[in-house]
A protein has these predicted regions:
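N-terminal chloroplast transit peptides
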Residues: 1-41
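A conserved glycine-rich beta-strand in the N-terminal activation segment of trypsin-fold
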Residues: 95-100, 121-144, 150, 170-172, ...
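C-terminal cap/linker of serine protease catalytic domains
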Residues: 98-104, 114, 219-223, 272-336, ...
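Active-site-proximal beta-strands of protease catalytic cores
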Residues: 110-111, 115, 146-151, 206-219, ...
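Active-site region of chymotrypsin-like
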Residues: 114, 125-128, 190-200, 226-286, ...
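Conserved active-site neighborhood of the chymotrypsin/trypsin-like protease fold
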Residues: 120, 143-225, 249, 258, ...
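PDZ/PDZ-like domain segments forming the peptide/carboxylate-binding groove
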Residues: 130-131, 138, 254-259, 263-264, ...
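PDZ domains, with a preference for the canonical peptide-binding region formed by the helix
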Residues: 153-156, 350-352, 363-401, 502-532
């Protein structure tokens, strides 16, 4: 069935972009969805307007949040012993000598089709989930009984099935790890019959510019395997639309369409050089697709092998300014045209103990950092400084060469993944909530913002979501999303999307802390102080008595999410406050809107 949809046309990168929506009839880009949906791209993805996950290229998403996928299936004729290869990326001999006769090469049979059933959380009604829907995507065999695909292909999965090329039987698959930042997911299939005669793919090295590349998958337009060819156009640190992170990416001009997401990209030797995952769409550009390179794939697989789970890509947690201006360098006593200026350090980052505002970072693990925040890459290229931190693992130590007040020195810091005050993905899949006398409290998250639409939140809350930093471990912005009308909350029933600041004079740290304060309160009244000095006072005993009626009226199973029943542990003995509320959020570099400022 043909897919007719309006494309997001603008390519501008805006900090507060305008909204857009479209309707598609049969397929999404990257996953093939089985129902008609109204789409609205997530706010953090609309910030770099043209960049889309494959499932969002034609505007189809799962009601409020995109779902992923590409196409693929596989059936193979090679030795089953190949299944037991390790997960490590192998850069040795090519799997085939000639790539010209692609249809005859057995490695095509390592590409499988993924069928996923999704049930996404309902962030507006956090005690329930959205309607179930299905999509299809791609994956491929990498050895040791494992499959690799995109994380957005299996987001919010309840059931995952895979089918090999030339076979009509589907097998149940299990999601072992899901890397939201790098948009990768690891699957396993326990049924030995699925692996009979399987031939896993071999990974190749990072390609060079103008190298030929072939993308394999099952895009819309047919049911059999599809092959498209092109060349490598660019290799650089790229914004990942699903993960909202900046990692190494390969730009190609081969057609990547709905159905290719999660499928492999091959070089001329038949080695897999990456995973297709997103495209760039605008009125002024065409044939711009992106592939996750094997360096990122290797990091993801090694992370899982080392820790038994995905722990993420670490960073320094600093806001850097380029030092191109000679007068600026002279004022900082930087003798050469190198180094980047530290303008801000995240309070929760380990680097906050060794770096401070005004330091100039001139080297990272002995590698010189240029004044444009770039470092040497391969023989004659340069790449963004962020590339060096992304090669590390959580808990690794980095040695920094810095200039402080004109003096050169060496410092060491531990690298950890960034923790957003307003997270882009909800861990565990289900949002937390607390209901007090009909007031529904929940942490502010990007999925909630997408679902509610920016217009209903107010500029102040949106500014906090985008520009505020967490000042201590575990901090959240807690809001009242709505009020379930009852006589106990008369006068407050029209509240919605307002941040709660204090309860009975105590500053609220997170949703769990709020639940703890409510549970331990002995006062006659519950006094909530909201932003803009709005006050809500409830009789504590009346509020408790009204709970059962409110739950029954709205068919809600509990006054709180399951995690809030656990004993509360204070996230920090001492809360380090910052004097600046805005302008220091760990948003992506493209969202900063200022070319000379970037996070690393």
């Amino acid at each position: 069935m043909a897919c007719v949809a309006a494309l997001f046309a603008s390519s501008a990168l805006l900090p507060f972009p305008s909204t857009a929506s479209s309707v598609a009839s049969a397929s999404s880009c990257g996953c093939r969805v089985r129902s008609t949906v109204v789409a609205r791209a997530p706010r953090h993805q609309r910030a770099h307007r043209g960049l889309r996950r494959l499932d969002e290229v034609e505007g189809v998403s799962k009601k409020r949040r995109g779902i992923g996928g590409g196409g693929g299936s596989g059936g193979s004729q090679a030795s089953s012993s190949r299944r037991d290869r390790g997960l490590a990326v192998d850069f040795k001999e090519p799997q085939v000598a000639d790539f010209d006769d692609l249809e005859e090469d057995k490695f095509l049979n390592a590409v499988v089709k993924v069928y996923c059933t999704h049930i996404a959380p309902d962030y507006g009604l956090p005690w329930q989930k959205q309607r179930q829907h299905s999509s299809s995507g791609s994956a491929f065999m990498i050895g040791d009984g494992k499959l690799l695909t995109n994380a957005h292909c299996v987001e919010h999965d309840t059931q995952v099935k895979v089918k090999r090329r030339g076979d009509d039987k589907k097998y149940i698959a299990k999601v072992l790890a899901r890397g939201t930042e790098c948009d990768l997911a690891l699957l396993s299939v326990e049924n030995e019959e699925f692996w009979k005669g399987s031939e896993p793919l071999q990974f190749g090295r990072l390609p060079c510019l103008q190298d030929s590349v072939t993308v394999v998958g099952y895009p819309l337009g047919g049911d059999t395997i599809s092959v498209t060819k092109g060349v490598v156009s660019r290799i650089e640190v790229t914004p990942y639309a699903h993960g909202t992170s900046d990692l190494l990416g390969i730009q190609i001009d081969a057609a990547i369409n709905p159905g290719n997401s999660g499928g492999p990209a091959f070089n001329e030797q038949g080695e897999c050089i990456g995973v297709a995952f997103q495209v760039y769409r605008s009125d002024e550009a065409e044939n711009i697709g992106y592939v996750i390179p094997t360096t990122v794939v290797s990091h993801f697989l090694n992370d899982y092998k080392k820790n038994g789970k995905y722990t993420g890509f670490p960073c320094l947690g600093v806001l850097l300014q380029k030092l191109e201006n000679p007068a600026l360098r002279e004022s900082l006593k930087v003798p050469s045209s190198e180094g980047v200026l530290v303008r801000r350090v995240e309070p929760t980052a380990p680097a906050s103990t060794v770096l401070r505002k005004g330091d100039v970072i001139v080297s990272f693990d002995g590698i010189s950092v240029g004044c444009e925040a770039t470092v040497p890459f391969r023989s004659t290229e340069r790449i963004a400084f962020r590339y060096l931190t992304s090669q590390k693992y959580a808990g690794d130590i980095a040695q920094l060469g810095i200039i402080r007040d004109g003096n050169s020195m060496k410092v060491q810091t531990v690298l950890q993944p960034r923790k957003h005050l307003v997270p882009f993905h909800v861990e565990g899949g289900q949002p937390s909530y607390l209901i007090v006398a009909g007031l529904v409290f929940t942490p502010l998250t990007e999925p909630f913002i997408e679902e509610e639409c920016e217009d209903t939140l107010g500029l102040k809350l949106l500014a906090k979501a985008r520009y505020s930093l967490a000042t201590f471990e575990g901090e959240q912005i807690v809001i009242v999303s709505q009020v379930l009308a009852h006589e106990v909350n008369i006068g407050y029933e029209h509240m919605g999307n307002q941040q709660v600041m204090k309860l009975n004079g105590t500053a609220i740290k997170n949703i769990h802390h709020l639940a703890h304060l409510v549970d331990t309160c002995k006062d006659k009244f519950l006094t909530f102080e909201f932003e803009d000095d709005f006050l809500v006072v409830l009789d504590r005993e009346e509020a408790n008595a009204a709970s059962s009626d409110i739950l029954k009226e709205h068919a809600i199973p509990s006054v709180r999410s399951s995690g809030l029943s656990e004993p509360y542990v204070d996230p920090a003995e001492e809360i380090q406050k910052t004097s600046e509320d805005f302008g220091e959020s760990p948003v992506t570099n493209f969202e900063m809107g200022i070319d000379c400022l970037l996070w690393a």
